[in-house]
Amino acid sequence: MDQQIFKHFQSQIETSMVVGDAFAESIANAAEKVTAALLAGNSIFTCGDKSAALLAQLFSDYLALGFEIERPGFPALNINKMADNNSGNQRFSQVLNIHARSADVLLVVSAGGNSPPLISVIETAIEKDMSIVLLSAANDDLLAASLGYNDVQISCAEFSGQLTAAAQFQIIQCISALIDHQIFGGE
């Protein structure tokens, strides 16, 4: 049992090292994109599928309620919560069509597999001239292909299973810390 515990935490540490090394530039770009939108008075919309829906909600909470410092909240809305009563591939798109504006940012967290509702919401964001940050996973080639030149993709496809969610969690925390630092300064 001790060996299994050690292997579990060793894989978590290795994942953290890969995330910090391989994704630093993309994480910085994502944080800059979200920060610029917030400073311009725009909103951040988040959504995800499967277990990634929880990570999208967490990012909205970090923006709206604060991450590591006490501060005023930022305008962040989780589309999953707003689309709870809807079903089908257009459920996220319908909410985005109603509430989002050009220059807002959509952050999408995918658990993998080219989720049709996520493809649809990305297409809607493109039609509305929004910026997109995509935290993708394995088999998300259609999601990635939908992105524009100025959008940001952080692909966690090299990780498997729970390590994908762990990597995405760390990325969300890092983006949140960078946003707070860029807007409020500090260490």
Stretches with model-predicted labels:
Residues 1-21:
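Generic N-terminal amphipathic, Lys/Arg-enriched alpha-helix
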Residues 4, 22, 26, 163, ...:
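Catalytic cores of large soluble enzymes that bind and process phosphate-bearing ligands
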Residues 8, 15, 30-33, 59, ...:
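A ubiquitous structural signal for well-ordered alpha-helices
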Residues 19-40:
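A short, well-structured juxtamembrane/interface segment
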Residues 45, 49-186:
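Glycine-rich phosphate-binding loops that contact phosphosugars or nucleotide phosphates
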